[in-house]
């Protein structure tokens, strides 16, 4: 019997149960095991054929967890980013990896627009004033008429670009591909990032973390940004040089940042980001929402059906194929 191990420790308990119940109902021929904590993996990880998880949920324990998966044939990532999985040398070569590419356009677009509006209208300042019962009126900035740079032109950007245009923004795409989707006034190659960064009022990072993008937003790039510009990172923490960003924010070389992803997650309690007045933090929930499981269910069902039927070559969103 095929054994499926569900490891989703960062999801609310109800969502974990919902995932297991769905798999049990639609695939009664498989054995479902659930682990909510690292210690609960031990009875199951060595014999599991399928691991259902988020890459970020593995975190710093990814090497240890995947290294014990001696029977793994498929890691089903319920998110888009898989660097926490595919970059782990301990993952057996016979295991294929899939993700949920294409499922996050709407929630990530909403997160990006919320971030831009909250930064432009100084929402942290409003909340601090509310907490102090302090009445202070000030002029907020508009995002209409401003230029947004979207770094990474994938499925999310295809939704975000037109949405920004609808709000009256000028949209500049930055990408390593030659794709020209609608919703962009202009698209330039990633090699020109430092050249165009000074044009931007809002810089939204959506690109995957790879060897080519690791720390690509460094001190030199940040120094070219407008002092009135905002940085929004919804992709991966490793894309931005965090010490350089901290320095730029402290010295007000940029106006502020909204950060959903970090080099170390969970973010340590003593990290400088927590106490910075020009920073908005969220705990890697840009794509996650109350209806998330409902959104990914069709793809989970389709891929499980194909896998169990032996139609591996027909599976969707395979980001790493199994090796013989």
Where are these regions (language model features)?
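N-terminal glycine-/charge-rich "phosphate-binding" loop or analogous flexible N-terminal tail
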Residues: 1-50, 55-57
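A short, aliphatic-rich alpha-helical micro-motif
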Residues: 41-46, 66-69, 143, 195-200, ...
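Phosphate/diphosphate ligand-binding glycine-rich loop within oxidoreductases
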Residues: 47-127
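Short, conserved loop/helix-junction motifs that constitute active-site signature segments
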Residues: 63-71, 88-92, 222-227, 248-252, ...
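C-terminal helix-to-coil terminal segments
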Residues: 98-111, 125, 263-324
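Glycine-rich NAD(P)-binding loop of Rossmann-like domains
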Residues: 125-159, 186-187
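NAD(P)-binding Rossmann-fold cofactor-contacting core
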Residues: 166-183
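Rossmann-like adenosine-cofactor binding region
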Residues: 178-272
